[in-house]
């Protein structure tokens, strides 16, 4: 008998599923996040929401806005916990320059899609994204439905 490997839990903490529906995701970047102690504890407990989050560039630095990290009930009373504060993103200069140049173009924005663990550090997956128009969203939905229907037809035709 072979030994069973212990199941590894997923490193993903939270996802922004709405981003794939709202944007054409183009370039992917991995950024570290500058967090306080209570935020790390809350993230470990899974009390994070990045569904409406986005990245802005201010004074040559990237900041995450709209991410909500709820403080734990056991949080220290001498520290003021602000769930909606802006958090600095840690990127290499070359990546930051690329984001600055691209975000200044018309119709492009920087969207956070996933927050996950990489070793002991919380990392944020961000994309350079272009907004979809409503007809693009409808086309995406039609294509997805057609793929589902095609798979269903192929499954039944094999029998």
Curated annotation (Swiss-Prot):
Sorted UniProt keywords: Cytoplasm, RNA-binding
InterPro entries attached to this UniProt entry: SmpB, SsrA-bd_prot, SsrA-bd_prot_CS
Keyword Cytoplasm recorded: yes
GO function terms (MF aspect): RNA binding
GO cellular component: cytosol
UniProt xrefs under Gene3D superfamilies: 2.40.280.10
Localisation: Cytoplasm
Chief location: cytoplasm
GO biological process annotation, one example: trans-translation
One Pfam family this sequence matches: SmpB
Family, as annotated: Belongs to the SmpB family.
Protein task: Required for rescue of stalled ribosomes mediated by trans-translation. Binds to transfer-messenger RNA (tmRNA), required for stable association of tmRNA with ribosomes. tmRNA and SmpB together mimic tRNA shape, replacing the anticodon stem-loop with SmpB. tmRNA is encoded by the ssrA gene; the 2 termini fold to resemble tRNA(Ala) and it encodes a 'tag peptide', a short internal open reading frame. During trans-translation Ala-aminoacylated tmRNA acts like a tRNA, entering the A-site of stalled ribosomes, displacing the stalled mRNA.
Designated name of the protein: SsrA-binding protein
